[in-house]
Curated annotation (Swiss-Prot):
Mg(2+) binds at residues 70, 72, 130. It comes from Hemiscorpius lepturus (Scorpion). It catalyses: an N-(acyl)-sphingosylphosphocholine = an N-(acyl)-sphingosyl-1,3-cyclic phosphate + choline; an N-(acyl)-sphingosylphosphoethanolamine = an N-(acyl)-sphingosyl-1,3-cyclic phosphate + ethanolamine; a 1-acyl-sn-glycero-3-phosphocholine = a 1-acyl-sn-glycero-2,3-cyclic phosphate + choline; a 1-acyl-sn-glycero-3-phosphoethanolamine = a 1-acyl-sn-glycero-2,3-cyclic phosphate + ethanolamine. Its EC number is 4.6.1.-. Its cofactor is Mg(2+). This is Dermonecrotic toxin Hl-PLD1.
Length: 324
């Protein structure tokens, strides 16, 4: 029992209250530390809302629990980015024709991801741009890389006000599209934003090509970090998990693929498929129903959680026990 040697009862009470408060705060801090430690052991998951191409859809998907969004970027024949637009055909049960001008879309993204904005959404941490460039000539792909770099610099990283805090994954279908990457990287370097790009920009080749071929393409480009790898198919069809599991194994191994940091699956709408993908070891999923993935993560709350802004999308997190 604590003893008080102050002359007044009031002084003694103050001391006892202070001691009690210190004990309470210390206890809370210990419990929070334990809680944080337990949270750190859970795999952070990127819940990526699919085909969010109209400005009005952005907050709709965020309100459903998405912490990341995917938008399609369509170009003219010369490589100028025009619209966030998918077109037909697209996933089952979706409107394929929603769109916005790319410039206007990115302006809205900045409003939602700049901490000083009245519209700031703390939980919105990543934007994936699905670049529709495969039918372009190499010259047009190069133009597309420069134009996208200019738009990101102008709309998200420069000008008055705070810059956007979110991360960006630039996704394109095939290794033959890498002229875009060369041009993008050269452009951000020439504009003085190379360090910002290294911090904020990642890459994904999404066309289900051979994983070794994809890894070699990155090595040829000199990309040694910030790589995501996807596997998937439209929600209208089913697909084996063999290639997905192979990608997860390569992520888990620094020797196999050092630059590969995250693996995600697309497009996943059934809760049963979401559960299977989590068991395989993915870091994220593209879904038309982010609220369903939130529900699944609640079931997996002992081992998984939604990623937040403190989680780096460029950090490799191997599984504790590998099945490779």
């Amino acid at each position: 029992m604590a003893h008080c040697y102050y002359n007044s009862k009031r002084g003694c009470n103050r001391v006892m209250k202070t001691v009690a408060l210190v004990v309470l705060i210390s206890t809370v801090m210990v419990e929070e530390s334990r809680g944080d430690s337990q949270e750190d052991k859970k795999r952070p998951i990127w819940n990526i809302g699919h085909m969010v191409n109209a400005v009005k859809q952005i907050e709709e998907f965020l309100d459903l629990g998405a912490n990341a969004l995917e938008a399609d970027v369509t170009f003219d024949d010369n490589g100028n980015p025009k619209w966030t637009y998918h077109g037909t055909p697209c996933d089952c049960f979706r409107d394929c024709l929603r769109w916005e001008y790319v410039d206007e879309y990115l302006k809205r993204i900045r409003e939602l991801t700049s901490p000083g904005s009245s519209k700031f959404r703390k939980g919105f941490i990543l934007l994936m741009l699905d670049l529709k460039i495969s039918k372009l000539s190499d010259n047009a792909k190069s133009k597309a890389g420069k134009e996208i770099a200019d738009m990101i610099i102008k709309r998200l990283w420069s000008g008055s006000g705070e810059k956007a805090q979110l991360y960006i994954v630039l996704s394109f279908p095939y290794v033959n599209d890498i002229e875009f990457v060369r041009a993008f990287r050269e452009r951000v370097k020439s504009k003085g934003f190379a360090s910002e790009a290294e911090k904020r920009i990642g890459w994904d080749i999404s066309g289900n090509e051979d994983l070794g071929k994809i890894r070699d393409a990155y090595q040829k480009l000199g990309i040694t970090d910030n790589v995501w790898q996807s596997d998937g198919i439209t929600n209208c069809l089913t697909r084996s998990h063999d290639r997905l599991a192979e990608a997860v194994c390569k992520r888990d191994s620094d020797k196999e693929w050092p630059s590969l940091k995250k693996v995600y699956y697309w497009t996943v709408d059934k809760q049963s498929s979401m559960k299977e993908a989590l068991k395989v070891g993915v870091d994220g999923m593209i879904t038309n129903d982010p609220d369903d993935l939130v529900a699944v993560l609640n079931e997996f709350s002992g081992t998984h959680r939604l990623a937040n802004i403190n989680d780096s999308p460029w950090q490799k997190i191997p599984r504790p026990k590998s099945n490779c």
